[in-house]
């Protein structure tokens, strides 16, 4: 059986290091003798149920570690279930029982170090490149046992569409990018051209060929296929590493890029500049025959550079961008790749690119900023030195990214440990049941304190295009190292809330100097328009988005402001100002005023706010209403709040809930789920947004209806059902936050019970 380990290293691994004793680290190991026959049967049954229902509920319920934790803690639900009939009203007693049942269950899922483990995955292009990298470097068998391979294949089979393809993410339609990547992954893992469960390979290849073959794969796919040797580098648009030696004032200098974009194209430019191609094995030669409509040797690579399947095209490239790529391809690249320029410029650029890669690797303990970047940086280190320590350090951190659930093994974005725990702590504190869960609160408080970043990136970080990080919180754990504004805001807010409670219940409070550091981070990330960026200060011109090199995502070139980050910062700084009125008060007051104005300006015509990190307008509106309320705005004096309330009330379904399609994110208009389908997480968001607006004083009936749906959705165990994925990024890709189904319904019930008058 597979088992989740918490906060552990890799034994005496000399290539693994940490800043805080691995707090928050999550790794899976397989025990061939583990589990009783009954426990093994329960895992088999969970897998069967998921597979049988995979086209209806595409996100896993994240059951494997949950069953493990509940078993280890001998969990038993002792609080009787409650249901509210159509003719009945929600009472204080009913709400309290449902809340306590949910908290009792959720508390049993807390890890020993204080965080809540959870899947944070869903994109179907995360895992295959890792398999490609290990295949190229010859470490596939060393890293992936037969059990790993079995579970990776299970995941691929579970998320194959009925038409034979794979979507960009688990909820989406089939795309050339992910169908090709997952097909090649199956072949590398030993499946024949027509093998795999239910003829998975044959069906996938049929989809690929019927949609034009892999010449229509998007640019990221062209890059990975070129690295594998299944494509030719001359069929890709240039990614010259010489950009790294441009003067910093140059408009398209990498320093002006969004951090994730910069960190993707850093190793890509190195591999492109090297024209690196992995070993041409018999499998690679066979794939060249399987994936094209014409013989490989007859393909005109120059003409396929701009091809992209319509199923993959979310951001059609403007003409100006194609002119840029053509100019680089025809005029610049032939010179840069030949003597003397390859010695004068290219070699220097490649060395500088590797310097940046090593710097980023070291400052993230070889986790890197995310899974896409992790694999590319790892491969670049191997290309530089196959036997070097840099590559070995990367190998030691692969297990941090792997996650197991009933749908198989997948690769995480990089873990949401701090993010989920910050939300969870706010939900539990809102319950006003602190005396019943003091141990849970104390552990969570300790984890949050331990996860705060204690230093800036090493050395002259500004020359490496990095921002301050001292005092920040990351999305995952401290070792990751990358500051995020809303994670910092939630970490700060939690510490402030804990400081208002007795230390004998929640433990000692965080040092005020550490809180001052986090305030400094937040103040540094506000833009001139009042909005809050996520990772680094904004400043690059908006027109650079015209050069977005991906066809699948939007707004990836430069850093942007986000309503959710802005709201989170307002909430944290408003509370900080109350508790520490003498620290940078003038700056904080001005910050909140400008941030509230930004939120008002970002409201759409229908009264909603676009959600950048959750689906979608329901999520964004919850955050915006919470932020405006924290800034002191009310329904009576703020038109934006009134319009936001009107939007939420109009979107409420007859059953009392809310249900929004992930298509809202890409279409940028509100699209309800078909029929009377409500999502319990989105219902919780809407309920909390309305409560923040003061709806209880005006008309509590919509709140009662929403609470009734949440209460009646609760399962016998105190858990809530897994429904559609509710996270998103880059406008076009969903992300599954498996802990959301517990955190947000509990948070909403806690707010409802505390702030709405009940009989």
From Swiss-Prot:
Keywords: Isomerase, Repeat. Saccharomyces cerevisiae expressing Glycyrrhiza uralensis CYP88D6 and CYP72A154, combined with the expression of Arabidopsis thaliana beta-amyrin synthase (beta-AS) and NADPH-cytochrome P450 reductase 1 (ATR1), accumulates glycyrrhetinic acid (GA) and, to lower levels, beta-amyrin; these GA production was increased in the presence of G.uralensis cytochrome b5 (CYB5). It catalyses: (S)-2,3-epoxysqualene = beta-amyrin. The active site is at 486 (proton donor). It comes from the Eukaryota. GO terms for molecular function: beta-amyrin synthase activity. Gene3D superfamilies: 1.50.10.20. PFTB repeats lie at residues 149-190, 592-632, 641-682. GO terms for cellular component: lipid droplet. Its EC number is 5.4.99.39. InterPro entries: SQ_cyclase_C, SQ_cyclase_N, Squalene_cyclase, Terpene_synthase_CS, Terpenoid_cyclase/PrenylTrfase. One of its GO terms (biological process) is triterpenoid biosynthetic process. Belongs to the terpene cyclase/mutase family. NCBIfam families: squalene_cyclas. Converts oxidosqualene to beta-amyrin. This is Beta-amyrin synthase. The gene is BAS.
């Amino acid at each position: 059986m597979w088992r989740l380990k918490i906060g552990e290293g890799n034994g005496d691994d000399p290539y693994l290091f940490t800043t805080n004793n691995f707090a928050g680290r999550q790794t899976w190991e397989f025990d061939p003798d583990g589990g009783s026959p009954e426990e093994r049967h329960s895992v088999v049954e969970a897998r069967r149920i998921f597979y049988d229902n995979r086209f209806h509920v595409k996100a896993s319920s994240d059951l494997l570690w949950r069953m493990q934790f509940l078993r280890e803690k001998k969990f038993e639900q002792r609080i009787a279930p409650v249901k509210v009939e159509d003719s009945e009203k929600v009472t204080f007693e009913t709400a309290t029982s449902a809340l306590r049942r949910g908290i009792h269950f959720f508390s049993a899922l807390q890890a020993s170090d204080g965080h809540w483990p959870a899947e944070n995955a869903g994109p179907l292009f995360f895992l295959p490149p890792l398999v490609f990298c290990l295949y190229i470097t010859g470490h596939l068998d060393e890293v992936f046992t037969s059990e790993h391979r079995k579970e990776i294949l299970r995941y691929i089979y579970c998320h194959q569409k009925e038409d034979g393809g794979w979507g960009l993410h688990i909820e989406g339609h089939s795309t050339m990018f992910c169908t090709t990547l997952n097909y090649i992954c199956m072949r590398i893992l030993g499946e024949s051209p027509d093998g795999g469960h239910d003829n998975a390979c044959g069906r996938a290849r049929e989809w690929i060929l019927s949609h034009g073959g892999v010449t229509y794969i998007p640019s990221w796919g062209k890059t990975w296929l070129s690295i594998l040797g299944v494509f030719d580098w001359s069929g890709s648009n240039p990614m010259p590493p010489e950009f790294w030696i441009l003067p910093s004032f140059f408009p398209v200098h990498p320093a002006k890029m969004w951090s994730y974009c910069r960190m993707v194209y850093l190793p890509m430019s190195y591999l492109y500049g090297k024209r690196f191609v992995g070993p041409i094995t018999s499998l690679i030669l066979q794939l060249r025959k399987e994936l094209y409509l014409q013989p490989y040797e007859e393909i005109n690579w120059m003409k396929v550079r701009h091809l992209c399947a319509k199923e993959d095209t979310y951001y059609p490239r403007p003409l100006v961008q194609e002119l840029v790529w053509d100019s680089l391809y025809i005029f610049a690249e032939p010179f840069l790749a030949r003597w003397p320029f390859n010695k004068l410029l290219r070699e220097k650029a490649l060395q500088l690119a590797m310097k940046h890669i090593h710097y980023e690797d070291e400052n993230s303990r070889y986790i890197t900023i995310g899974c896409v970047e992790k694999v590319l940086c790892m491969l670049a280190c191997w290309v530089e030195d196959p036997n070097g320590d840099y590559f070995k350090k990367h190998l030691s951190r692969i297990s941090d990214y792997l996650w197991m659930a009933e749908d198989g093994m997948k690769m995480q974005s990089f873990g949401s440990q701090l993010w989920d725990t910050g939300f969870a702590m706010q939900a539990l504190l809102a319950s006003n049941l602190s005396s019943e869960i003091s141990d849970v609160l104390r552990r969570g408080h300790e984890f949050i304190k331990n996860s705060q970043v204690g230093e800036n990136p090493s050395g002259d970080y500004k020359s490496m295009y990095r921002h301050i990080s001292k005092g920040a919180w990351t999305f995952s754990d401290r070792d990751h190292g990358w500051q995020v504004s809303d994670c910092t805001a939630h970490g700060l807010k939690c510490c402030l809330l804990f400081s208002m409670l007795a230390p004998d219940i929640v433990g000692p409070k965080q040092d005020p100097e550490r809180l001052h550091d986090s305030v400094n981070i937040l103040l540094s990330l506000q833009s001139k328009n009042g909005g809050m960026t996520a990772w680094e200060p904004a400043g690059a011109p908006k027109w650079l988005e015209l050069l977005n090199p991906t066809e699948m995502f939007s707004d990836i070139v430069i850093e942007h402001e986000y309503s959710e980050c802005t709201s989170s910062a307002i909430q944290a700084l408003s509370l900080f100002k109350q508790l520490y009125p003498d620290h940078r008060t003038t700056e904080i007051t001005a910050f909140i005023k400008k941030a509230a104005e930004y939120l008002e300006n970002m409201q759409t015509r229908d009264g909603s706010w676009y959600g950048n990190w959750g689906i979608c307008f329901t999520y964004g509106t919850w955050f915006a209403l919470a932020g405006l309320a924290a800034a002191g705005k009310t329904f009576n004096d703020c038109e934006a709040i009134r319009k936001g309330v009107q939007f939420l009330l109009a979107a409420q379904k007859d059953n009392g809930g809310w249900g929004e399609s992930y298509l809202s994110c890409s279409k940028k208009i509100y699209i309800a789920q078909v029929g009377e389908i409500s999502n319990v997480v989105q219902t919780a968001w809407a309920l909390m947004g309305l409560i923040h607006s003061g709806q209880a004083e005006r008309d509590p009936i919509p709140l009662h209806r929403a609470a009734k749906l949440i209460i009646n959705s609760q399962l016998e165990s105190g858990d809530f059902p897994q429904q559609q994925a509710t996270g998103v990024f880059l406008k076009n890709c969903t992300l599954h936050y498996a802990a959301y189904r517990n955190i947000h319904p509990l948070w909403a019930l806690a707010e409802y019970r505390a702030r709405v008058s009940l009989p």
